[in-house]
């Protein structure tokens, strides 16, 4: 097992010993082997959705824990294939993307329609597929930071996918159209029995104020999570909160002083717990993103993110660039270290 405390370094006590005095854990719907029977059984999803959610939970190294380790590789569209795969050209071949997820013991591999369709007959029965339906691409100039549908729900279903995903840029000029598109797509996905995952990202230049990037503030990302759950996301993917007070800084929208005085603190675990509270207290699962590849600190950064997510009550990590920009062996090692956090019974809910 990974030496988690050593990787956390000076943050070990602050993260591993923290007691949450904001939102009590007994008010949350926490991950567990019985999550589908205990939590999802209340909702209106068809039985096939529950079956496919259980399929996700029963796959990989985290099988039976209620936690998820997902490999996302859609950056070939979002960030360009060259920028994404030049470090490891083998990942230009979709086969190796799926092999990385299998070798690392992930619950699921998430990628574009094209990537997964090109190898679906060989792999769809070996590891659950999550097809990302929409993307932003950086070939159009100037970049409008919009999300365009690249595939239909039916295309994902026909290749054997158990889940679909999409991004909405909440706060952007295009967000209301995106909300309508993805709400309809998620409705259709549920009709076909697929799990729905929303990348609930913020996007507006006004969210950067006085040198602080409030795209990762707990209050604003929390509201994005609430909107994601509103349109039927079974799982919400969100960037880990790094600050708070976005509403106050941009002086727009509605908030309450108790969000900052009672429901959050400066501890990152409490900030992520507020993100989870906005996922209907965990009725929609919260997975945090692993972030960009940063070099020597990737392993410690990924483990830190996993510890915060788990102790806050989150459902897991969706980590891509930190893994696939390394050799396959090192990528597997990094993903396994993250999984070790969720397998470690000594790392408890705060």
Swiss-Prot record:
Keyword line: Acetylation, Cytoplasm, Glycolysis, Lyase, Schiff base
Keyword field contains Lyase: yes
Top-level taxonomic group: Bacteria
Top-tier EC class: lyase
Keyword Cytoplasm: yes
GO molecular function: fructose-bisphosphate aldolase activity; identical protein binding
UniProt subcellular location: Cytoplasm
Modification N6-acetyllysine, positions: 208, 262
GO CC, one annotated term: membrane
InterPro entries named among the record's database cross-references: Aldolase_TIM (IPR013785), DeoC/FbaB/LacD_aldolase (IPR002915), DeoC/FbaB_aldolase (IPR050456), FbaB-like (IPR041720)
BP GO annotations: glycolytic process
Positions of the catalytic residues: 237
PANTHER family associated with the record: FRUCTOSE-BISPHOSPHATE ALDOLASE CLASS 1
The enzyme's E.C. designation: 4.1.2.13
Disulfide pattern: none
Protein role: Catalyzes the reversible aldol condensation/cleavage reaction between glyceraldehyde 3-phosphate and dihydroxyacetone phosphate (DHAP) to yield fructose-bisphosphate (FBP).
Descriptive protein name: Fructose-bisphosphate aldolase class 1
Record-linked Pfam families: DeoC
Effect of residue 237 to A: Loss of activity
SUPFAM superfamilies: Aldolase
Family in the record: Belongs to the DeoC/FbaB aldolase family. FbaB subfamily.
Subunit structure of this chain's protein: Homooctamer or homodecamer.
Signal peptide: none
Catalysed reactions, semicolon-separated: beta-D-fructose 1,6-bisphosphate = D-glyceraldehyde 3-phosphate + dihydroxyacetone phosphate
Activity regulation behaviour: Activated by citrate.
């Amino acid at each position: 097992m990974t030496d988690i405390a050593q990787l956390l370094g000076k943050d070990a006590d602050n993260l591993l010993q923290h007691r949450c005095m904001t939102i009590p854990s007994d008010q949350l719907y926490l991950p567990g082997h019985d999550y589908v029977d205990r939590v999802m059984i209340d909702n209106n999803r068809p039985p096939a959705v529950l079956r496919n959610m259980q399929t996700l939970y029963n796959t990989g190294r985290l099988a039976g824990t209620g936690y998820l380790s997902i490999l996302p590789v859609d950056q070939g569209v979002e960030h360009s294939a060259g920028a994404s795969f030049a470090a490891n050209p083998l990942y230009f071949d979709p086969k190796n993307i799926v092999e990385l997820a299998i070798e690392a013991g992930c619950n699921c591999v998430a990628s574009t329609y094209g990537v997964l369709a090109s190898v679906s007959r060989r792999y769809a029965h070996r590891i659950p597929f999550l097809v990302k339906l929409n993307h932003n691409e950086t070939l159009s100039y100037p970049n409008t930071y919009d999300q365009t549908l690249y595939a239909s729900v039916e295309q994902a279903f026909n290749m054997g996918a158990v889940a679909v995903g999409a991004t909405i840029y909440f706060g952007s000029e295009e967000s209301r159209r995106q909300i309508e598109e993805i709400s309809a797509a998620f409705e259709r996905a549920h009709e076909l029995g697929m799990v729905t995952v929303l990348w609930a990202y913020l996007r507006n230049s006004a969210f950067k104020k006085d040198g602080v990037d409030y795209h990762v503030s707990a209050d604003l990302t929390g509201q994005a999570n609430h909107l994601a759950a509103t349109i039927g996301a079974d799982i919400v993917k969100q960037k880990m909160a790094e600050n708070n007070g976005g509403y106050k800084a941009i002086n727009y929208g509605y908030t309450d002083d108790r969000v900052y005085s009672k429901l959050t603190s400066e501890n990152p675990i409490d900030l992520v717990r507020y993100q989870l509270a906005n996922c209907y207290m965990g009725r929609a699962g919260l997975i945090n993103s692993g972030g960009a590849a940063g070099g020597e600190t990737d392993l410690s950064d990924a483990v830190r993110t996993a510890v915060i997510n788990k102790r806050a009550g989150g459902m897991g990590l969706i980590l891509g660039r930190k893994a696939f920009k390394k050799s396959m062996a090192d990528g597997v090692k990094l993903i396994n270290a993250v999984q070790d956090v969720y397998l470690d019974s000594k790392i408890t809910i705060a």
